[in-house]
Design a protein with these regions (language model features):
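Active-site and NAD+-binding cores of ADP-ribose-processing enzymes
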Residues: 2-67, 97-216
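Extended catalytic/binding region for NAD+/ADP-ribose chemistry, centered on the ART fold
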Residues: 67-99
Length: 216
């Protein structure tokens, strides 16, 4: 059909402008890798009173989120983080558009050794055998299948580097391989007054709502 886009759908999905096949790849993969050096900073928002989470804890229950690689018979853990506060906020609250800072904490994490990540941004996703829309598809089962494939195929990687579906900033999903190489440099309640101005700016920049200020 000349002059028209042809939509390919293998299963119901909101990523309707591209075809996302399940793994394994239909072509030879030539993966790209991205290394975060020792001392690199990652930011993470978590709920300290939920499931006994700490600043550096990996979630064992799942699969739930986009790149969860959990499977029966394996001790799998996942930790999601961003390189910026804006990435963390939109990843956590982008779906609702309302920043809920109650009971949440912001952790500043440092890597105690280099972290090797599979590059899924830009052409990286195609080099890995999929497409960049993998990071934004509403079909979580499909993206989880790919994460399990990446985890099994590349035992040297600590996780994946992908683009946030909300603002395309760099986001990280770390596998349990990186569980003991993260150090919490600092953590603050998300409603801490020192974060207030920055959160308001990010909320405005992303057309999100921020909660009223609290006294901390």
């Amino acid at each position: 059909m000349q002059g028209n886009w042809i939509v390919f759908l293998q299963r119901p999905t909101l990523s309707a402008v591209v075809r996302i096949d399940p793994p394994p790849p239909r072509r030879d993969a030539r993966p790209l890798f991205h290394e975060l050096g020792t001392g690199s900073r990652l930011l993470r928002i978590y709920q300290s009173e939920r499931f006994g989470q700490t600043a550096t804890s990996f979630r064992r229950n799942g699969p739930l989120s986009r790149f969860d690689h959990h499977r029966d018979g394996l001790d799998c853990g996942i930790l999601y983080a961003g390189l910026t506060l804006s990435c963390c906020l939109v990843e956590c609250f982008g779906d609702t558009g309302v920043i809920d800072d109650q009971g949440r904490r912001l952790a500043f994490l440092q890597a105690t050794r280099p972290l090797l990540l599979l590059q899924l941004r830009g052409r990286g996703a195609m080099r890995a055998g999929s497409v960049a829309a993998l990071a934004s598809t509403a079909d979580r089962q499909l993206s989880q299948e790919w994460s399990r494939h990446f985890h099994a195929t590349y035992p040297q990687i600590d996780g994946v580097l992908y683009s946030s579906a909300h603002n395309e900033e760099a986001a990280v999903a770390l596998y349990e391989r990186a569980e003991h190489v993260l150090h919490c440099e600092m953590e603050l309640p998300l409603d801490h007054k020192s974060l207030r101005s920055r959160i308001l700016t990010i909320a405005s920049d992303h057309a999100m709502e921020a909660p009223p200020a609290t006294q901390r």
